[in-house]
UniProtKB/Swiss-Prot annotation:
Species of provenance: Arabidopsis thaliana
Stretches annotated zinc finger (FLZ-type): 162-205
Family matches, as Pfam families: zf-FLZ
Subunit structure: Interacts with KIN10 and KIN11 via its FLZ-type zinc finger domain. Interacts with KINB1 and KINB2 via its N-terminal part. Forms homodimer and heterodimer with FLZ2 and FLZ10 in vitro.
Function: May act as an adapter to facilitate the interaction of SnRK1 complex with effector proteins, conferring tissue- and stimulus-type specific differences in the SnRK1 regulation pathway.
Keywords linked to the UniProt accession: Metal-binding, Zinc, Zinc-finger
Family: Belongs to the FLZ family.
GO molecular function annotations of the record: kinase binding; zinc ion binding
GO biological process, one term: response to glucose
Record lineage: Eukaryota, Viridiplantae, Streptophyta, Embryophyta, Tracheophyta
Induction entry: Down-regulated by glucose and sucrose but up-regulated by mannose.
PANTHER family in alphabetical order: FCS-LIKE ZINC FINGER 12-RELATED (PTHR47208:SF5), OS02G0174800 PROTEIN (PTHR47208)
Name this protein carries in UniProt: FCS-Like Zinc finger 12
Length: 228
């Protein structure tokens, strides 16, 4: 006869002894005083929640900070509706110059253990700490835009509407003529103009090496100059 206890019925159906088992089937029936019967399982409504009324992203971080629980750095990147909801926390992100990130996917939000939050948007950085939660609006942008790399400068040059329209040395028009390329982004009307440009660059490089040799006292071989 099955026990009236639901836990006893579940355990009796979960464990089935083998055909050659030496253990009596009686041992597979839980008693009324089984430790599982004495355990108190929490109800779904009693678990502690950190959603702060349905919030996500930094809402969880704020709840953890209030409960004095240490956290590791948390990073949120804009990704549509599944990303960090800046519209919900618009009061905490009052950017200068009217920047609205609520609909943007080009930002990254990072929160560190000490409570400092940084928001990276394009080439700008905004950061704030705990004091800003109380109304302080001090923002700072420590990121400085670095100089453009040579590769980026060459890309900009290729995108220029005047690209390969005139010789880079004598400025003659190149339309309808053979173009002699140098470094992939400089066009010349003749081999002579291109050779002069190569010589000019070689002399500049030699001057740099000579300056280094004077400063360090080391002998550095000068590059050869080859005319094409």
């Amino acid at each position: 006869m099955l026990s009236s206890n639901p836990m006893t019925w579940k355990l009796s159906h979960m464990v089935v002894p083998g055909k050659n088992s030496t253990i009596s089937p009686d041992y597979f029936t839980a008693s009324q005083t089984s430790p599982l019967d004495m355990m108190k399982f929490p109800s779904p409504g009693s678990s502690k929640r950190y959603d702060n009324g349905g919030g996500i992203g930094l809402g969880i971080v704020a709840a953890l900070e209030k409960s004095s629980i240490g956290i590791n750095p948390v990073c949120h990147t804009g990704a549509g509706s599944k990303g960090f909801d800046l519209a919900r926390y618009s009061k905490r992100f009052q950017f200068a110059a009217g920047i609205d990130l609520s609909d943007s996917e080009e930002y990254t939000c990072v929160t560190t253990r000490d409570g400092l939050t940084k928001v990276y948007y394009k080439e700008e950085e905004f950061e704030f700490g705990h004091n800003l939660l109380n109304g302080d609006q001090r923002w700072r942008k420590p990121i400085e835009i670095a100089e453009e790399s040579p590769a980026k400068e060459r890309r900009v040059l290729r995108d220029c509407p005047d690209f390969l329209t005139s010789c880079c040395l004598c400025k003659k028009k190149l339309q309808g003529k053979d173009i002699y390329m140098y470094k992939g982004d400089e066009g010349f009307c003749s081999k002579e103009c291109r050779s002069l440009k190569i010589m000019e660059d070689s002399l500049k490089e030699q001057h740099k090496l000579t300056s280094v040799e004077v400063l360090t006292g080391e002998e550095i071989a000068s590059p050869g100059i080859f005319l094409i």
